[in-house]
Amino acid sequence: MIAFLSGHLVAIEWGERSSLTVEVQGIGYRVKAPGRFLKQLPAVGEPVRVFTHLVVRETELVLYGFGSPAERDLFVELIKVSGVGPALGLALLNTFGLPELVQAVVTENVRLLSLTPGVGHKTAQRLALELKTKLAHWRQGMGVADQPLAGGPPMPIREEVEMALLALGYSTQEIQAALQALPTHPRPTEDWLRDAITYLSQQP
């Protein structure tokens, strides 16, 4: 198994291909990755390290890449779930940051999980059912459990605010960024929602 690649970034492909090419000792490796990770990459030509998971298919070998061992390991757990292949695994990690995704699974937030492109209600339920206990233990071992989200309301207020903002047309990425940017002092759901809308309206 190829645990990681350490070399120079050659290219980034966006959209459906969503991948990067890394040159390691004269060999170029094409690695599929979530768009969220691609946005964090340095400029082409700069050194880069990508943590990888190899998926063996009948006709090809496919490398999937991530920004940390924890993201890679979470991807591996996701694709073990029946009906969740690598494409949906990437979609989940592109829609949510690692702490948000783990929290959504552990708290069985099916409505939030099903907002991921390609993830229906039944698949979201299956994710929560099969991974809830496993991820609760896994995140403790990875040190994720004791790392609260940077900003944002506590559950279940967070879920109410997220659903209200989604109904207003904001994307999941925009909502997560807004909630993490807000101060954490206690306040009613309505105030959290108003503050989030104010923040989002000020963004370019």
Swiss-Prot record:
InterPro entries: DNA_helicase_Holl-junc_RuvA_I (IPR013849), NA-bd_OB-fold (IPR012340), RuvA (IPR000085), RuvA_2-like (IPR010994), RuvA_C (IPR011114), RuvA_C_sf (IPR036267)
Keyword annotations of the record: Cytoplasm, DNA damage, DNA recombination, DNA repair, DNA-binding
Segments forming a coiled coil: none
Disulphides: none
Location of the region described as Domain III in the Swiss-Prot/TrEMBL record: 157-204
One protein family per Pfam: RuvA_N
BP terms from Gene Ontology: DNA recombination; DNA repair
Example of a GO cellular component annotation carried by this entry: cytoplasm
Region (Domain II) location: 68-146
Family in the record: Belongs to the RuvA family.
Biological role: The RuvA-RuvB-RuvC complex processes Holliday junction (HJ) DNA during genetic recombination and DNA repair, while the RuvA-RuvB complex plays an important role in the rescue of blocked DNA replication forks via replication fork reversal (RFR). RuvA specifically binds to HJ cruciform DNA, conferring on it an open structure. The RuvB hexamer acts as an ATP-dependent pump, pulling dsDNA into and through the RuvAB complex. HJ branch migration allows RuvC to scan DNA until it finds its consensus sequence, where it cleaves and resolves the cruciform DNA.
Name of the protein this chain belongs to: Holliday junction branch migration complex subunit RuvA
Gene: ruvA
